[in-house]
Amino acid sequence: MNQTVIYAGTFDPITNGHLDIIQRSSRLFGKVIVAVAKNPSKQPLFSLEQRVELVQQSCQMLNNVEVIGFSGLLVDFAKQHNATTLIRGIRGADDIEYEIQLAQLNQKLAGQLETIFLPPAVEWRYLSSTMVREIYRHQGDVGQFVPEIVLKSLR
């Protein structure tokens, strides 16, 4: 499909699960915009600029992926970039209810904005940035969960 889609998140940090969703989306769609969100209600491990850079470096081999930092409403960002579809990763039942509510709210706010749910590959189903941060804060090894560039930035 020659369609522009958006995959949004805080990506603090980007994980191999995120990267799996980005890679698979890039095979399905003409252009994938990875929208790195500034979320004032969270205390990030990395600044917005650092997260954008880490995602860019993690995705550099994907020619149809663009990484952009943003703040504000995702529906407004989607309109600015002429995207009519959002990609959301869902790990399991715990994510589904929240993600459906979010998709319905986004559609209510933006009309034609659709959401496509992609589960991660089985080996990343349990993985989240929150878990990676917790392991890291307790001096655990996160090397198997994040791209190499993230691991280097954490050291």
UniProtKB/Swiss-Prot annotation:
Main location: cytoplasm
InterPro entries for the chain: Cyt_trans-like, PPAT, Rossmann-like_a/b/a_fold
One of the GO biological process terms: coenzyme A biosynthetic process
Pathway info: Cofactor biosynthesis; coenzyme A biosynthesis; CoA from (R)-pantothenate: step 4/5
Binding site for substrate: T10, K42, L74, R88
Requisite cofactors: Mg(2+)
Catalysed reactions, as listed in the record: (R)-4'-phosphopantetheine + ATP + H(+) = 3'-dephospho-CoA + diphosphate
Gene Ontology molecular function: ATP binding; pantetheine-phosphate adenylyltransferase activity
Gene3D superfamilies (alphabetical): HUPs
Sequence positions that bind ATP: T10, F11, H18, G89, I90, R91, E99, W124, R125, Y126, L127, S128, S129, T130
GO cellular component labels: cytoplasm
Keywords: ATP-binding, Coenzyme A biosynthesis, Cytoplasm, Magnesium, Nucleotide-binding, Nucleotidyltransferase, Transferase
Any single Pfam family the record assigns to this protein: CTP_transf_like
EC number(s) from the headed UniProt entry: 2.7.7.3
Residues marked Transition state stabilizer (site): H18
Alphabetized CDD domains for the sequence: PPAT
Compartments where located: Cytoplasm
Enzyme class: transferase
Protein task: Reversibly transfers an adenylyl group from ATP to 4'-phosphopantetheine, yielding dephospho-CoA (dPCoA) and pyrophosphate.
Record-linked HAMAP family: PPAT_bact (MF_00151)
Quaternary data: Homohexamer.
Family: Belongs to the bacterial CoaD family.
Protein name per the record: Phosphopantetheine adenylyltransferase
Naturally occurring in which organism (per UniProt): Glaesserella parasuis serovar 5 (strain SH0165)
Protein's gene: coaD
